[in-house]
């Protein structure tokens, strides 16, 4: 999408809008390639954009299934295989979807993921600014830091998956809904406003509304409420979509499963150029 003299290239996908895209598109030329760009900010012209997962990886997985049988279709694989999680911790991640980054491997070795949700958390945290919280989440995981606002167990239930940190955008919505009594629709509006605002105007307007809702709908004491508010203020702008993180982690897990249990077929499929 394009705005004034600055434009950003985004992944391919389906764009849903009320106006014909042919009326909005223009061609841009860069590095000897043409790009079809939308010469407006995304908020001006469309409500939704659905990205497309790289098809090559899924095609390679299908090649493996064609060889080993539908019994091992990705949808039928168990998601709790200890050997697979050991592979992630070992660093042997070549050709593992989205997880073969040399800078991600040391983090996985430290975090020692033991569930698909751990993979999702690490994938989400491997972003600017969220990286600053990596030592905290590793400490929380291995030191049994379960003190996530004891006086209201619902907060613990919401934050336990991310070891007490606000990693996902969806977690923010659940906190507002369950703890402050704010509808999911209103919570999503707050999320968008806060994450777009660079002046802190929206977060300052949000805090008293959130605190009022907590006092009415939760059993948090004043200290816990202040701590939860600070967590939101400090992390909301860096949160990541759980739907994105978890879905990519599942695909990575599938790759790792085949690499562990069907190594020959995996290597053959991922070395093939016939995709």
Where is each model-derived feature located?
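Noncatalytic, beta-rich nucleic-acid-contacting surfaces in large DNA/RNA-processing enzymes
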Residues: 1-275
């Amino acid at each position: 999408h394009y705005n004034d003299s600055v434009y950003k290239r985004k992944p391919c996908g389906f764009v849903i809008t009320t106006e014909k895209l042919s009326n909005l598109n223009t061609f841009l030329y860069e590095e000897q390639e043409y790009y079809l760009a939308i010469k407006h900010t995304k908020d001006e012209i469309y409500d939704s954009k659905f990205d497309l997962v790289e098809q090559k990886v899924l095609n390679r997985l299908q090649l493996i299934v064609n060889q080993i049988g539908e019994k091992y279709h990705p949808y039928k694989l168990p998601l709790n295989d200890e050997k697979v999680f050991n592979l992630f911790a070992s660093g042997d991640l070549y050709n593992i979807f989205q997880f073969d980054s040399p800078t991600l491997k040391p983090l996985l070795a430290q975090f020692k993921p033991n569930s698909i949700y751990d993979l999702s958390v690490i994938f989400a945290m491997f972003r600017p600014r969220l990286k600053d919280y990596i030592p905290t989440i590793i400490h929380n995981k291995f030191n049994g830091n379960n003190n996530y606002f004891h006086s209201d167990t619902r907060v613990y239930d919401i934050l336990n998956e991310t070891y007490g940190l606000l990693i996902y955008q969806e977690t923010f919505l659940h906190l507002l809904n369950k703890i402050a009594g704010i509808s999911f629709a209103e919570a999503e509006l707050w999320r968008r406003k806060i994450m777009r605002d660079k002046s802190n105007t929206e977060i300052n307007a949000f805090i008293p509304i959130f605190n009022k809702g907590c006092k009415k709908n939760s059993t948090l004491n004043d200290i816990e409420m202040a701590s939860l508010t600070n967590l939101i203020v400090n992390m909301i702008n860096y949160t990541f979509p759980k739907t994105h993180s978890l879905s990519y982690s599942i695909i990575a897990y599938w790759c790792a499963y085949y690499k562990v249990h069907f190594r020959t077929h995996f290597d053959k499929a991922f070395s093939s150029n016939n995709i």
